[in-house]
UniProtKB/Swiss-Prot annotation:
Residues 121-130 have a biased composition (Basic and acidic residues). The gene is RDUF1. Pathway: Protein modification; protein ubiquitination. PROSITE patterns: ZF_RING_2. The keyword Zinc applies. Induction: Induced by abscisic acid (ABA), and drought and salt stresses. A zinc finger (RING-type) spans 215-256. GO terms for cellular component: cytoplasm; cytosol; nucleus. Expressed in root tips, leaf tips, junction of carpels and pedicels, stigma, anthers, pollen, vasculature of sepals and petals, immature seeds and embryos. GO terms for molecular function: ubiquitin protein ligase activity; ubiquitin-protein transferase activity; zinc ion binding. This is E3 ubiquitin-protein ligase RDUF1. The keyword Transferase applies.
Length: 395
């Protein structure tokens, strides 16, 4: 149960036969820091009679996490190929994170459980002691960065996370999956190549600028005399803006007029989502990455990002505005060029256009700490704060 006072201090269990002050140097089990909203590992190199402090915020508002063997959460079924894929992807993420600067937060791994809703059926524990547990729609795991691997998340911490907006986020992601779009896919399919190429090229004149002064994708003012592309709905855009946009979704950014799209064919294996990784961003909101059983070698799923200001926990009745990316295919040519290929260039242009448009439509909270997306030259995605980097190369 979460303490009801932020000044509360949870001290570790220590053994002492005398009243003499002693000093210990041992690595403790995991702790949950309520102030940082993250898991921590603490070196007890201090007065044994003093409380353990979080190394990030230097606060004592922490709770020791019980050993996973005592948890009622089911252990990861390591025999399945899907879970082996999740663990290998997770280890790769951890290796990349450790090679970069020390981050101030860590992810929660969410796997699809056997339950179909909020309250699952009762099943017998694996220990064979006759006790039962509730099979949940989602199973939560975490890694505290100590090298011990994934552990089941204790029920008490799961309840805290669900109460902080995770439950609503998971419901939204489930609705996206059920609608057939999938996590990381846009609501509209990409426009067909022939439809994009058939868009007429027009020279922007004063007549055009009187009707539309700005490109709706990048929001920049049109300059008379430059070339633009005209949609069938008669809306005008920069060619470098509307082509990447239509390569992601087939609708007009202004009126939602839809261009023809190619039939989408996906195998059942490719559609099977095993689980996801959720980052609680310090500035508010979440970043979500999906583990997929059908991911081919050299292929990555770039994350969908939902922010609290867009329906991630502020009580808005609107659906979440989300930035959705397609699969990133890494070819031998991209590997040799460090990820700089023609496809990579087009993806980066699409990112710039999407970010510019999302900046325009995203409601403001009166703060300069809104989140934007940045695509590194090597094709990796980061969620950025306008003043501080929040996520460092997590895929």
């Amino acid at each position: 149960m979460m303490p009801n006072s932020r000044s509360a201090t949870i001290t570790p269990t220590t053994e002492s036969t005398t009243t003499t002050t002693t000093t210990t140097t041992t690595l403790t089990t995991s702790y949950w820091c309520y102030s940082c909203t993250r898991f921590i590992s603490v070196w007890e190199d201090q007065d044994a009679n003093a409380g353990v402090l979080c190394p990030y915020c230097n606060g004592g508002f922490i709770e020791e996490i019980e050993d996973s063997s005592n948890s009622t959460v089911a252990a990861i079924p390591a025999s399945t190929p899907e879970v082996r894929s999740v663990e290998e992807t997770h280890r790769s993420i951890i290796r990349r994170r450790r090679s970069n600067r020390r981050t101030s937060f860590n992810p929660v791994i969410v796997l699809h459980g056997g339950g179909g809703g909020g309250a699952g059926e009762r099943v017998e524990n694996e220990e064979g002691d006759g006790a039962t547990r509730e099979r949940r729609a989602y199973e939560f795991y975490y890694d505290d960065g100590s090298g011990s691997g994934l552990r089941p998340l204790p029920d008490s911490v799961s309840e805290i996370l669900m109460g902080s907006g995770f439950e609503r986020l998971l419901e939204q992601l489930s609705q996206i999956e059920a609608s057939g779009n999938g996590i990381g896919r846009s609501g509209n399919p990409p426009a067909s190549k022939s439809a994009i190429e058939s868009l007429p090229r027009v020279e922007i004149s004063d007549c055009h600028t009187k009707a539309e002064a700005n490109c709706a994708v990048c929001t920049e003012v049109f300059e008379a005399g430059i070339e633009g592309r005209e949609m069938p709905c008669k809306h005008i855009f920069h060619g470098d803006c509307i082509v990447p946009w239509l390569s992601i979704r087939n609708s007009c950014p202004v009126c939602r007029f839809e261009l023809p799209s190619d039939p989408i064919q996906r195998s059942n294996e490719e559609e099977h989502a095993v689980g996801m990784t959720i980052w609680r961003l310090p500035g508010g909101g979440f970043a979500v990455g999906r583990f997929n059983a059908g991911v081919r070698e050299g292929e990555r799923i770039l994350p969908v990002v939902l922010t609290e200001m867009d329906g991630g926990g502020l009580g808005s009745n609107e659906g979440p505005r989300r930035i959705s990316w397609v699969r990133a295919h890494e070819t031998p040519e991209m590997s040799r060029n460090g990820g700089r290929s023609g496809n990579g260039g087009r993806l980066r242009r699409a990112v710039r256009g999407m970010v510019s448009f999302m900046r325009r439509v995203r409601p403001s909270r009166g703060s300069s700490n809104s989140n934007v997306i940045d695509l590194d030259s090597d094709g990796e995605t980061r969620v950025m704060n306008r003043s501080t980097s929040l996520i460092r190369r997590f895929f």
